[in-house]
Amino acid sequence: MITVGCDRPTSLAAIDVAGRFEGVWATVGLHPHDAKDGVDTITDLFDHPKVIAVGECGLDFYYDNSPRDLQRVAFAEQIQLAHRLALPLVIHTRDAWDDTFDILRAEGVPPNTIFHCFTGGPAEVATCLDFGAFVSFSGIVTFNTATDLQAAAKICPLDRLLIETDSPYLAPTPHRGKRNHPAWVPLVGAFIADLRGIAAEDIAASTAAATCLAFPGIAP
């Protein structure tokens, strides 16, 4: 299980949980909502052995909780961190695909880049795949209205496809609207398996393998 940091306090909490439990790892990042805090507030946290990625980071032009110019700077700085530390990069992007892609092109895409809680369609997934990135689908893919997202899940190669819950948010159907839990990730996998006409066990095996590729720090 990977628990995600979004600012200094949540990154410290993620490290604490990862340090106390076997099979749990942490990421350290500055979410675009908190970009105004500055990336220097988290850079001392990457030395912990259970920290396996930078993020989540990126751009969120839906809420704009931090000014967009600061979001862009913080995202670029965290891409540079991922390069310098040779760590995977976990990306959050909302209503900002073009800017996200432009910054990645400018800074260079880290070898293990993950588009977390992917919300795009076939065109966006194609660009992510062109970057060599992994694409992670959450409970949103189970929603009846998520037809473009479902189309993307059908065409994403299995060796690049990940699943997640984004707990405590975005509980999958039939639990939509409830507090989400990591234990519900099989519902996401089973839904995608049904979309693709394959067995849920095949999705379980492929996503386990792809997760170890995306996050080398958790590989056995």
Label for each model-derived stretch:
Residues 1-220:
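Mid-domain alpha/beta scaffold segments of enzyme catalytic cores
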